[in-house]
Amino acid sequence: MQAVQFFDCAHNYSPGERPSKQQRAFYLAFPAVESLMQCGSTNFWIPANISNRMRKNTKRFEAHRTHPSTPGGAEGEKSFRTQTKHARQSHEPGLHWGHVGSWYDDLIGQDGSDHHQKLIIPGVLRMLDIKPGEHLLDVACGQGVLGRAAARRGVQTTGVDLAGSLIQAALERRENTSLEHYYQADVRDLAACGAIAPGIFDAAACVLAIANITPLSPVWQGIYTALKPGGKLVVVLPHPCFRIPKQSSWQWDQQNAMQHRLVDAYLTSEKIPIAMHPGRDTGPTTTTFHRPLQAYINTLGSAGLWIDHTEEWISGKMPPQGIRFAALDKSRREIPLFLALRAIKAG
């Protein structure tokens, strides 16, 4: 996908608890939970507080870092400009998910994960308030899970993604060929896609993908052009304040019987390679771009997309029953998993 980033860390596992086989598959691809460590080809599930100390004392990944220039300043993404003009993703594996498309399609399936079905897709469609017969642009659509859900409501959907394998999956999974349309194209150059004309879309969405795309501005500018005046955009991403790959983790405070969310770095923008199969000497990687919240707000505004509504979504997954349930559930309810931004096309 161009590229969906999925963090299943909100289950708030108690230290040392072993997730299910399916959940481990998510963690191997999206290491947002620091309870998985590797030694050679062996995976060890260890208490989060121990893994946090190990993480602080061990160089676990290579990251290109830059501090934002000015508070609330330009894009917070200028450190990533080495990828342009725009460093076409088709020539740089890791900046789209075509090379892991088959695996991802099998993982997500026809209707998406539990988070997609119960939280994300209902939330996106509610925030867009899109009606039957209206036209939705699904930016970085992957294998079309949002498009299928929208089409079931009678919405015309056009999905765009650079990963050819995922576009093929979206076409094969279509439920309504008259309402669902999918195209392989770079979302940073939407004008180059012949199916996207200026001012024809009532709404647009970018779901669990924007943190894997750089730079931001061409994406927003293309969406602005494609939307009708007053058209809405909803962007959903792992919450950039609390869900930072390899820079955030849960820690259990034994003395006070509390679970804390630790954040080691936030304002620094980072390009973070993610190994899809940790523990192996070789294997595919994807790339995540952490940015502070100001980067999203400022670039959207600069493109003429004005944020009018924001929601912070918590995980719907309950922690395990036990003596720590109340504390773990409080952290689940207080620390959001996803950030949803709605912006309106000005003019």
Model-predicted regions and their roles:
Residues 55-72, 76-131, 145, 149, 233-273, ...:
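Conserved class I S-adenosyl-L-methionine
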Residues 135-139, 143-192:
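Class I SAM-dependent methyltransferase SAM/SAH-binding core
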Residues 193-204:
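A short acidic, Gly/Pro-enriched loop at the edge of an enzyme's catalytic core
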Residues 202-217:
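A short SAM/SAH-binding and catalytic strip from SAM-dependent methyltransferases
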Residues 217-232:
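A short glycine-rich, Lys/Arg-flanked "PGG" loop and its adjoining helix->strand segment in the class I
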Residues 237, 241-250, 280-294:
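Acceptor-substrate binding/catalytic loop of class I
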Residues 287-310:
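Short alpha-helix
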